[in-house]
């Protein structure tokens, strides 16, 4: 049986990715003599400082190389199916401070490429390929990602308009190796979420919970985060991308403790991301109001996940989650009216204002979702993925219900919408802040595979928090 570790012990499948991108470029006939040229991110210094900025590899380059090194480049010769990686030559002055860089032999062993040269060889290689193509080769590159001095002389055309889109579209469907990386990022993140919940038992501030999450990720091999963690206690959870993470868990004025914490955080492992959200109680038990909302959100998520399979229409899944929210809020008395009328009037958007999820991969909000932020339908405006989900895609499923005054109060002051919300009942729920539950799900031909193992059942979460 193939294990996660055995898959990841192999090389990142850069060559297969290059072939898939070339197919999407639809090069045929004489166009098969084309090349793909990509550059890594450059080493950059902090302004007015001699320290390097935090390095984040360019995703298109990594996708076709698996190489995390800065200041590198690659050429994929489509006709010969040859992938060449170019790495920086040795800089004697840099060796004094940083040690010897990766050698050509080591890079050839580590990465799924046919040849490794130095970046000083790029122009000579380009000239040779152009000559072999008799002036009929097309050079595909990305606008704004070509170093000054790189020469495409002798090529029929330098096309900088289609490669980025071809890579972005190809990235939607993940291969076995990519799924393994995403699973590993999820495994590490699950451990970190558990550590964060356990840390809350002695923490006095949001930052201590964040610190526990970060420390666990680093200790388990994920030094980078997929995005800035969100650690939001009490009403801070009503802010979707709250990021201050520095609020006291007990109000310094009233001495009242916050009831719960929403933590949205995920590790980045070898360039691939996890994106997980959990809500847990402070003090070991959810308040009755938070538990009521939690149960609705969990049902929204479980039913949405159950719908996932190849070619499912994502808008349908999102709409179903809204209907579950409406049913739950009607049962609590927060909403008034019929389910169908509330759905048609989009009243649930006041409490669930964002999309159900997004593609996940090398970016947290991964490529290929084709969102329509100009959509006038408020229920779908912020849906980051539109259309049918292909097998092999990985998508987040993250429904939520929030009690954000800024969003809800316009509904309360409008004659058209105020009649659907019972303000007397609503008053009891402001302190809930927000509840969001988020998992990362691999869509398959048969259905789905949930990559996220962090506990989310109320009983499990309360045990960890006690």
Swiss-Prot record:
For this UniProt record, give its keywords in alphabetical order, as a comma-separated list. Aminopeptidase, Hydrolase, Manganese, Metal-binding, Metalloprotease, Protease
Quote the catalytic activity from the record. Release of any N-terminal amino acid, including proline, that is linked to proline, even from a dipeptide or tripeptide
> Where, by residue number, does Mn(2+) 1 bind?
275, 398, 438
Q: What is its EC number?
A: 3.4.11.9
Alphabetized CDD domains for the sequence: Prolidase
UniProt: Mn(2+) 2 binding residues:
264, 275, 438
Q: Which cofactor does it need?
A: Mn(2+)
The record ties this protein, via InterPro entries, to: Aminopep_P_N, Creatin/AminoP/Spt16_N, Creatinase/aminopeptidase-like, Pept_M24, X-Pro_dipept-like
Q: Please give one Gene Ontology molecular function term for this protein.
A: metalloaminopeptidase activity
Keyword Metal-binding found = yes
Q: How is the cofactor bound?
A: Binds 2 manganese ions per subunit.
Keyword Protease recorded: yes
- The entry's protein name is Probable Xaa-Pro aminopeptidase pepP
According to its UniProt entry, this protein's organism is: Aspergillus niger (strain ATCC MYA-4892 / CBS 513.88 / FGSC A1513)
């Amino acid at each position: 049986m193939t294990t996660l570790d055995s898959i990841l012990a192999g090389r990142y499948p850069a060559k297969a990715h290059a072939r898939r991108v070339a197919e999407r470029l639809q090069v045929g006939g004489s166009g098969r003599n084309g090349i793909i040229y990509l550059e890594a991110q450059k080493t950059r210094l902090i302004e007015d400082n001699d320290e390097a900025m935090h390095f984040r590899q360019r995703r298109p380059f990594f996708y076709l190389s698996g190489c995390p090194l800065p200041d590198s480049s690659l050429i994929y010769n489509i006709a010969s199916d040859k992938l060449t990686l170019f790495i920086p030559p040795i800089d004697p002055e840099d060796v004094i401070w940083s040690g010897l860089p990766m050698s050509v032999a080591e890079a050839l062993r580590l990465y799924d490429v046919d040849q490794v040269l130095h970046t000083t060889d790029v122009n000579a290689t380009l000239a040779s390929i152009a000559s072999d193509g008799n002036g009929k080769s097309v050079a595909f590159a990305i606008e704004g990602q070509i170093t000054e001095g790189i020469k495409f002389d002798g090529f029929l055309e330098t096309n900088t308009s289609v490669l980025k889109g071809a890579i972005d579209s190809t990235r939607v469907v993940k291969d076995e190796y990519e799924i393994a990386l995403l699973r590993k990022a999820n495994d590490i993140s699950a451990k970190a979420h558990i550590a964060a919940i356990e840390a809350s038992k002695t923490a006095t501030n949001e930052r201590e919970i964040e610190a526990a999450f970060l420390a666990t990720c680093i200790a388990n091999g994920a030094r980078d985060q997929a995005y800035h963690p969100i650690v939001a206690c009490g009403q801070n959870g009503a802010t979707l991308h709250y990021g201050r993470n520095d609020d006291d868990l007990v109000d310094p004025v009233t001495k009242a403790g916050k009831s719960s914490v929403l933590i949205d955080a995920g590790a980045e492992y070898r360039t691939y991301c996890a994106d997980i959200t959990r809500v847990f109680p402070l003090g070991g038990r959810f308040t009755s109001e938070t538990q009521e909302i939690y149960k609705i959100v969990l049902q929204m998520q479980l039913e949405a996940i159950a719908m996932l399979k190849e070619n499912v229409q994502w808008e349908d899944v999102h709409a179903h989650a809204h209907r579950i929210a409406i049913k739950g809020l009607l049962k609590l008395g927060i909403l008034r009216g019929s389910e169908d009328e509330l759905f048609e009037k989009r009243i649930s958007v006041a409490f669930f204002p964002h999309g159900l999820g997004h593609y996940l991969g090398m970016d947290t909000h991964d490529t290929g979702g084709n969102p329509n932020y100009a959509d006038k339908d408020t229920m779908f405006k912020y849906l980051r993925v539109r259309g049918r989900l292909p097998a092999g895609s990985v998508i987040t499923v993250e429904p939520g219900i929030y009690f954000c005054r800024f969003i809800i109060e316009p509904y309360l002051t409008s004659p058209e919408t105020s009649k659907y919300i019972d303000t007397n009942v609503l008053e009891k729920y402001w302190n809930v802040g927000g509840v969001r539950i988020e998992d990362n799900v691999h869509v398959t031909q048969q259905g789905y595979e949930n990559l996220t193992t962090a506990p989310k059942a109320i009983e499990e979460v309360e045990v960890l928090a006690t």
